[in-house]
Amino acid sequence: MKIKFELILLTVERHLPILEIGLPYIRRFINPDKITIIASKSCLEKINNIGFLDEDVVLLDEDNVVEGVTLDYVRFLVESRGGQAGRAGWYLKQLLNFAYAMRPETMDYYLTWDADTIPVQPISFFDDKGRMLLAKKSEYHEPYFSTIEALIGLKREVDFSFIAEHMMFKREYMLDLLRLIVRGGHLEGKVFVKNVITAIQSDHISGAGFAEYETYGTYVYKKSPKAVLVRDISSVRWGADLFGLKPSSSDLYTLSTRYSWASFESWKVRTVAQIRRRILLRILGKIWKFVIVITKYKAYILFKSKN
């Protein structure tokens, strides 16, 4: 039995070219029952002007997801803690992934997916027992766990990270977590946001002091371990270094021979070493693609024709 779920994409303007390329692959390889794009008002206007969306995609202003969860309010809280205002957008994205569960129309399950990431193989998010499949990663950042402990009283109990380019949320569990975050009080957007920002250590408020995926993963793995299954799944973050920010179908097919998804992050190269690395990876990408397309030409044509 297929478990229904919706997919939400939080995006900014610089990710729109990748999102335009990636959306057909999201439909093909993830096949959600509903897609919602969440962005600033100006970004939504640009999306409408580009006109690459189908009519069934829902557009939602980031300041209207849940009352009280706004960029201005997050910026105010970050600055009041002595943090840099420029980090507010980074925190807002994560807070919105949590807040989406508070919307009454939200489905029982919702998948968050990074807008700069393209799936290149079919990906399932539930096993045959209905357990949510969570990606297992190797990242470790101690301040995340200091915040988790201050926020909900849980320590790190696993030797891996839940931080990937997506997360499958069960609305029921997320609402329970939010109630824990507001400490039994009335579940309001402003209260939950304030409690999260307040829990971050002052030394890390201007950096990376909170991770929604690490927080949710830690909570669910502790409270409902039989509801999830952690898996190793192959992915790559430096798709842009290999193939640029406008990957072709042949680029994506090449990636699909090794990975389930690829991210195309628009990092700025600042040092000579970074420039050399990017040049080398771009050359390797061209060689890799040439070999794959030549040796697997029929499979490539099939991959291309289905999109």
Go through each PLM region and give its residues:
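Long, low-complexity C-terminal extensions of enzymes
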Residues: 236-307
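Nucleotide-sugar donor-binding/catalytic module of glycosyltransferases
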Residues: 19, 91, 98, 105, ...
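Active-site-proximal specificity loops/subdomain of glycosyltransferases
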Residues: 49-103
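N-terminal anchoring/stem segment of glycosyltransferases
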Residues: 1-73, 287, 291-306
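Short acidic donor-binding/metal-coordinating loop in glycosyltransferase active sites
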Residues: 62, 113-117
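Conserved donor-nucleotide/metal-binding helix-loop-beta segment in metal-dependent transferases, i.e.
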Residues: 117-151
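Short aromatic/hydrophobic "clamp" motif used to bind/position activated sugar donors
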Residues: 110
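Catalytic core and acceptor-binding pocket of nucleotide-sugar-dependent glycosyltransferases
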Residues: 163-253
